[in-house]
Amino acid sequence: MYWFKNAMIYRLTKKLDWSEEALQQNLTQNAYHPCGQSDMSRFGWSTPLRGAELLHFSVGKQILLVAHKEEKIIPSHVVKRELDNRIDELEQKENRKLKKTEKQALKDDVVSVLLPRAFSKNQQTAIWINTETNLIYIDAASSKRAEDVLALLRKSLGSLPVVPLAFANEPALMMTNWIARNEMPQYLTALEEAELKAADDKGIIRCKNQPLDSEEILSHLEKGKFITKLALDWETHLSFVLNDDGTLKRLKFADNIREKNDDILKEDYAQRFDADFILMTGELTALTENLLDDLGGEKTRL
């Protein structure tokens, strides 16, 4: 099962057709296929459930998709060495310097020769669509990776009106107040890790394994620094880092949560996958609701 390690959350601003038949048809147009001998990369949808044919996994109003990106890896020094050899050989043979366009043509030929022997780097990115709350969660640590996946989904569906989930109260201000005033929300526990920044972004302090109620940390907050990253524990169910842009990083579900479905036999892979997906989405939905409550709700967009 794809236990999310990060969560970049987006708000769907319009309702879309998520029916299984329509979704499968749309995703099939951009299904992932392995790179051919002349392909540098491939990007498309793969099956979330091992051995299944569907390019989506659905339980109730929850949908799981998996974007698969394959890239051929050709070390630049290998290309340079082979290219230099070819350039030297041709320049000596013709007793002249090659033009820029000729060198580029040689480079393209070198790459095409090396491609069939190149290793592949594979990357899978899970997407969870909550059609009940109209939120999309992407397991990505960078906005670039998330935007690439959203672009693939938009291409597949024809339209995808989304915006990043924004809180009414700035997370940096709220996190700072939680620590400075010792007023943590009831369901959250601050862990001993944070990042502090000055308003001008010139000074950054990163602390780890250090009590956040120490005089040193509180002094920085009194002098105007804000907490931009804060490690938190949510009701002993999972830990994560809340960022000032509202994204959740380094999600780690507690063992007692991940083991809840251990009574299901390992041989029954599909049933365990189903149960774990329901469990994970339920936990993250509840966490999102709690964060919205304590960060003033969702920001109103004009």
Curated annotation (Swiss-Prot):
* Any Gene Ontology CC annotation: cytoplasm
Q: Predominant location of this chain? A: cytoplasm
Q: Where in the cell is it found?
A: Cytoplasm, Nucleoid
Report the record's Gene Ontology biological process terms: DNA recombination; regulation of DNA recombination
InterPro entries referenced in this protein's UniProt entry, alphabetically: RdgC
Which GO molecular-function terms appear in the entry? double-stranded DNA binding
The alphabetized UniProt keywords are: Cytoplasm, DNA recombination
Question: This protein's superkingdom?
Answer: Bacteria
Q: What does this protein do?
A: May be involved in recombination.
Q: Which family does it belong to?
A: Belongs to the RdgC family.
Q: Which HAMAP family match?
A: RdgC
Q: By what name is this protein known?
A: Recombination-associated protein RdgC
The scientific name of the source species is Actinobacillus succinogenes (strain ATCC 55618 / DSM 22257 / CCUG 43843 / 130Z)
